[in-house]
Curated annotation (Swiss-Prot):
SUPFAM superfamilies: Anticodon-binding domain of a subclass of class I aminoacyl-tRNA synthetases, Methionyl-tRNA synthetase (MetRS), Zn-domain, Nucleotidylyl transferase. Its EC number is 6.1.1.10. Monomer. Zn(2+) binds at C143, C146, C156, C159. One of its GO terms (biological process) is methionyl-tRNA aminoacylation. This is Methionine--tRNA ligase. InterPro entries: Anticodon_Met (IPR041872), Met-tRNA_ligase_1 (IPR023458), Met-tRNA_synth (IPR014758), Methionyl/Leucyl_tRNA_Synth (IPR015413), MetRS_core (IPR033911), MetRS_Zn (IPR029038), Rossmann-like_a/b/a_fold (IPR014729), tRNAsynth_Ia_anticodon-bd (IPR009080). One of its GO terms (molecular function) is methionine-tRNA ligase activity. ATP binds at T349. Disulfide bonds: none annotated. Transmembrane segments: none annotated. It is found in: Cytoplasm.
C-alpha cells in the first residue's frame, strides 16, 4: 500500500471562490485523492483557508467586522461549500492556527541561523490619507508589463507577473482610493533565495515527470533577466503571524508580521498538525507524513495549483524547506493548471465575474459541475466555460450516456425478470469482446489517473460508459427476450453488473451519483476491479436491486438561457 500526501493550493479567505479557482486546485486534487483511496492506498489530503495578508483585512473592513471574526466566519462558509462539492479533505485547516504561527516562526529562526535571511532598509509606499504603509494588495494601479489597470501591488492577475508596489503606474490606495501617496523608508526581512539558486535548479531538473507548464514557469523565474531574486518575507500589517526568530523576539521587527506568501505554504505542514490535534493523535502521527527522519521517506507528495501559484511553490517554499537544513518532505509532483475563462472573459473573485461555488450549487447538484470542470480542465492551455458547452456536455455525457444506460437496463430487468439479478444463460462472444475492450480501457484509465492527466481520464471514463451502451444496442436483450429469454437474462445480468462497475470507476469524478448507483444495486462492494470478468460477476443471480431515480436530468434550453442571463454581469 502506497502512502500519498496531497495538498491543494489554499484559497484566500476573502469570499467564496469561483469555478475557475475550484478546477485549478481543489477539484483535481480531490479527484486524485478519491482515486488513490479507491485503489487501497493510504491518503492524507490537506487544504486550508489562507487567512493573512491584505485580502483578509480589506474583506473584513468591507464586511464591517474584526478581521479575526471575519476569518472564522468565512472559514466555516468555505468548509461547508467544500463539503457540499464533495471535496474529501482529511482536514480543512486555517493558516491562522496556533500550529502555523509556531511553525512559521520556527522556519524563520532556522533560516536566520543558516544565514539565509537579511535585513533590508527599503522605500515603501505610505498613504497620508490612511495614515499607514501600503504593502502589496493595499495598492492598485496599472501593470507596467501588460497595461492591466487593476493590477495589485504583489502580482498582476491578468499577466501573472510578480510586482512590487512601487512598480505600478498611477498607484492608488485600495483602502481609500487616495492617490496622496509618498515613499518612506522602512525595514524588512528578505529570504536569500538567490543563495539557493543552484540547489533549486538541480532539484527542478530532477523532476522529469513534471508538467511542462510547471517547469517552464519555474525555470523562467530562475533564469530570466537577473535570475532568482531574494524575496521580502515581512510586511507592515496588523493581521498576521508576528515576526519572531523561533520563540525569540526579532529586534527591529516589532509590530511587523510575516508576508502571507511565506506563511501560507507552511500551513500545508501545520494543517497536518491541526488534523492530529483534532483527532486526538500524537505529533508522531503527522510527522510521519512530513519528516523524512520520522517515517515520511516512503511518502509520495503531490501538489495541485493554478499556474499563478507555481513560482512560490517551486522556488520560495522549497527554498524555505531546503534552507531550514531539516529533513522535511519535498514535493514529488507538482500538477499546475492554466486558467478557466468565463464566457469570453476572465473569472475574477475581486471583480465578482463568473459563477461562484455557492451559486453553482443553487442551480444544480455538485456532480454536474464536477464532471464538466474536470472533463474540461485547463491543463495544456486556458479553457473557457460557456453555458452552451456546459449544457451539451451534461446532456450528452451524463444524461444520454451514463444515465440512459442505468435507466434502460434496470427498467427492462424489472419489467421482464423483476427487481433481482436474473439467472440463466452464459456470456458469449459479444460479452467476451466487451470484457476485452473494458480491460484495455480500464488499464488506460488507471494510467491516465496515475499520471494526473485529468481530461484524458475523463475521456476514457466516458468511453467505458459508452461501451456499455454500445453493447446494449448490439445485444438488444429486449429483442432477444422474445426468442431466447435465458440468454437475454445473461445479457441483463452483465448490464446490472456494469452499473456496479461504473459506480466504482466513476466515484472520483461523480461521487454522489456513484453512491446512488451502488445504493440502487443494493451493494456496498466498492472494491476497485482487478479483473473485469470477475467484476462483471460480482452481483450474483438472485441479488436484489431497485430502479433508481433519474441520475442526471437534462438541462433545457430555457434553463440555460436563464442562467446565461443571470450570470452575465458581476456579483454584487
Amino acid at each position: 500500500m502506497a502512502r500519498i500526501l496531497i495538498t491543494s493550493a489554499i484559497p484566500y479567505i476573502n469570499g467564496i471562490k469561483h469555478l475557475g479557482n475550484l478546477v485549478g486546485s481543489q477539484l483535481p486534487a480531490d479527484l486524485y485523492a478519491r482515486y488513490q483511496r479507491g485503489r487501497g492506498n493510504e491518503v492524507m489530503f490537506l487544504c486550508a483557508t489562507d487567512e493573512h495578508g491584505t485580502p483578509a483585512e480589506l474583506a473584513a473592513a468591507k464586511a464591517g467586522k474584526p478581521v479575526a471574526e471575519y476569518c472564522a466566519e468565512m472559514h466555516g462558509v468555505q468548509a461547508d461549500i467544500a463539503r457540499r462539492f464533495g471535496l474529501s479533505f482529511d482536514h480543512f485547516g486555517r493558516s491562522s492556527s496556533a500550529q502555523n504561527h509556531k511553525l512559521t516562526q520556527h522556519f524563520a529562526g532556522k533560516l536566520a541561523e543558516n544565514d539565509l535571511i537579511r535585513e533590508v532598509s527599503e522605500r515603501q509606499v505610505y498613504s497620508n490619507a490612511d495614515g499607514r504603509f501600503l504593502p502589496d494588495r493595499y495598492i492598485e494601479g496599472t501593470c507596467p508589463n501588460c497595461g492591466y489597470d487593476k493590477a495589485r501591488g504583489d502580482q498582476c492577475e491578468n499577466c501573472t507577473k510578480q510586482l512590487d508596489p512601487t512598480d505600478l503606474i498611477e498607484p492608488r490606495s485600495a483602502i481609500s482610493g487616495s492617490t496622496d501617496l509618498e515613499v518612506r523608508e522602512t525595514k524588512h526581512l528578505y529570504l536569500r533565495q538567490s543563495a539557493l539558486k543552484d540547489q533549486l535548479d538541480a532539484w527542478i531538473d530532477s523532476k522529469a515527470d513534471w508538467p511542462v507548464l510547471t517547469t517552464s514557469i519555474a525555470k523562467k523565474w530562475l533564469h530570466d533577466g537577473d535570475g532568482l531574486q531574494d524575496r521580502g518575507i515581512t510586511r507592515d500589517l496588523d493581521w498576521g503571524i508576528p515576526v519572531k526568530k523561533g520563540e525569540q523576539d526579532w529586534p527591529g521587527m516589532e509590530g511587523k508580521v510575516f508576508y502571507v506568501w511565506f506563511d501560507a505554504p507552511i500551513e500545508y505542514i501545520a494543517c497536518a498538525g491541526e488534523w492530529a490535534e483534532a483527532h486526538g493523535k500524537s505529533d508522531a502521527e503527522w510527522e510521519r507524513w512530513w519528516r523524512t527522519d520520522k517515517g515520511a521517506d516512503d511518502v509520495r507528495y503531490v501538489q495541485f495549483m493554478g499556474k499563478d501559484n507555481v513560482p512560490f511553490h517551486t522556488l520560495s517554499f522549497p527554498a524555505t524547506l531546503i534552507g531550514s537544513g531539516e529533513p522535511w518532505k519535498m514535493v514529488d509532483h507538482l500538477k499546475s493548471f492554466n486558467y478557466l475563462n468565463y464566457d469570453g472573459g476572465q473569472f475574477s473573485t475581486s471583480q465578482g465575474r463568473g459563477v461562484f461555488m455557492d451559486q453553482a450549487l443553487e442551480i444544480l447538484p455538485a456532480d454536474y459541475w464536477r464532471w464538466w470542470l474536470l472533463s474540461h480542465a485547463p491543463e495544456n492551455s486556458d479553457s473557457e466555460f460557456t453555458w452552451e458547452n456546459f449544457q451539451a456536455s451534461v446532456n450528452k455525457d451524463l444524461a444520454d450516456v451514463l444515465g440512459n444506460f442505468v435507466s434502460r437496463i434496470t427498467k427492462f430487468c424489472r419489467s421482464k425478470f423483476g427487481e433481482e439479478v436474473p439467472e440463466g444463460g452464459a456470456y458469449g462472444p459479444q460479452e467476451e469482446a466487451l470484457i476485452a475492450e473494458l480491460t484495455t480501457r480500464l488499464r488506460a484509465y488507471e494510467g491516465h489517473m496515475e499520471a494526473m492527466e485529468v481530461r484524458k481520464s475523463a475521456q476514457e471514463l466516458r468511453a467505458i460508459w459508452a461501451a456499455g451502451n454500445e453493447y446494449l444496442q448490439s445485444a438488444a436483450p429486449w429483442t432477444l427476450f422474445k426468442t431466447d429469454p435465458v440468454q437475454a437474462a445473461a445479457q441483463v445480468r452483465l448490464g446490472l453488473n456494469l452499473i456496479r462497475l461504473y459506480a466504482v470507476l466513476s466515484a472520483p469524478f461523480i461521487p454522489a451519483a456513484s453512491a446512488r448507483m451502488l445504493e440502487a444495486m443494493q451493494t456496498s462492494d466498492d472494491n476497485w476491479p482487478v479483473d473485469i470478468a470477475t467484476a462483471l460477476n460480482a452481483l450474483a443471480p438472485g441479488h436484489a436491486f431497485t430502479v433508481p431515480e433519474v441520475l442526471f436530468a437534462k438541462i433545457s434550453d430555457e434553463d440555460r438561457e436563464g442562467w446565461q442571463q443571470r450570470f452575465a454581469g458581476v456579483r454584487s
